[in-house]
Amino acid sequence: MWKNRALALTLVSILLISNVVLLTILVETDALSEGDVAIGKAAPRGAPVNLPSLKGGAILAANQWPDACSFVDQEEIKAIFPGVKNIEQESRPVSALSIKDFAVDSSWKESDRSESGQCLYSMRLPGETYSATQFWFRIEAVADPKLIVGYADRVAPGTNTNQGARGADRCVITGLNEGSWSCRKGPLLFTVGGRTTVTFKGTPAPAPFVWRDDVLPEFVQTITAKIK
C-alpha cells in the first residue's frame, strides 16, 4: 500500500513538473513571437549625393569622397525598420592607401584618407533592451565607372547574385556565412554590413541570413537611389 501511494505521489510530481515545463515553453514561445520584427521597404528620399563626372580612368582622391552618412538618413532607416528607436550615427575614417602604394611612397598624404568614408548606425529594434543592432556603409572607391567595373571584379570577388543588387549595377556576397555585400553603382564601389540580435517575422532562416538576404538589399536600394 505504501509503495502504491509513493508511486502515485511520484507520478503526480512528474505530471506537475511536466506541466510547469510546458507552460514555460509556451510563455517563452509567445514572448518570442511578440518580439519578432517586421522588415519594411526602402523609401529613398532627399537629394542625390554629389559625385563628379569621372572619365578617362580618373580616380577621386579619398579626401574628396562624400560623407558616407549622407547616403542613409534616420527616416530611411525607419522605413526599413518600423518601430526602430534610438538611432545614432557615427562617421569613421577610411584609408584608400594600398600596401603597394605605401611601399613606393610611405609619406603621409591627405588624399589617401577620407575622414568620413564609413558610417556606422546603431539602433534599438523591438524586443532589444539596448541598441544592439548595427548597420554600416563604407565607401571603397570612387572612380571612372569603367575602371570601377574591372577594379570591383578584382578586389571584391564573391558569389554574384541579383538578390542584393536592388538598384546597384552588381553586388556580390563576399562569404556565404558573412552578412555583408560588396556593390558597385556607376562611379561608386561600396560595402554594406551589420548585425542584429532580433528575429524577423515570416522568415524561417536564422537572423544572420535574413539580415544579409532581406534587410541589406533594402539599404542597398536606399544608397543607390542617391547616385545619379
Regions flagged by a language model, labelled:
Residues 1-36:
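Hydrophobic single-pass membrane-targeting/anchoring helices
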Residues 28-228:
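A small/polar (G/S/T-enriched), proline-flanked helix-loop surface module common
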